[in-house]
């Protein structure tokens, strides 16, 4: 199995009030194709910074982030923008959508900017509607953004992240703003996407969410302190035991 993401000696430093803040310190890890990997750790440990940096949404201070063999840090601005648009999908805790567009128009917007192919609006719209149907939200296709629930909106964000058929999805607290029912529904959809072959890296503070992944990385003070291997992502085998075992391991890590 090939590596989707290969991170070596990654460092990220910010200068705040003329003082150096080393947020990531020689981080090393890999994510294989088809994996669904969670990143956990205390608040301020560098979880989100790690996700933003390895995906090229934030600059790398030192080290390498290899995305399917391409060095993120060596790409120019245009090449990096094209890579993120065509081969990466992004989901965030804050569900950003343009309020002057319908739900489906928000979902298909990235397809107009993609260089994967020159498609007609009809074909792009059909693909967006197919994704909405797949995720069970086709009924809100023509709704305004303020007319849908948080759970529906996050599923729409998943559709948008998939519109260009990305190789990998990066999700920062994708269930953080949702209640438990909506959270479970969103995770079920992400698991389905993963089982179809899309690699996923997600940041979460929720043990229940992380226990649905195939592997968990634990970061403390900008360093990967350990990793925990689970069964296949989304496995229904021993779900309660998976959560308990993961929670016990996190406690050992200092959670």
Region spans (language model):
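Conserved ABC transporter NBD signature motif
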Residues: 63-71
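Conserved ABC ATPase signature
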Residues: 144-148, 152
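The feature captures the beta-strand-to-loop junction immediately N-terminal to the Walker
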Residues: 40-42
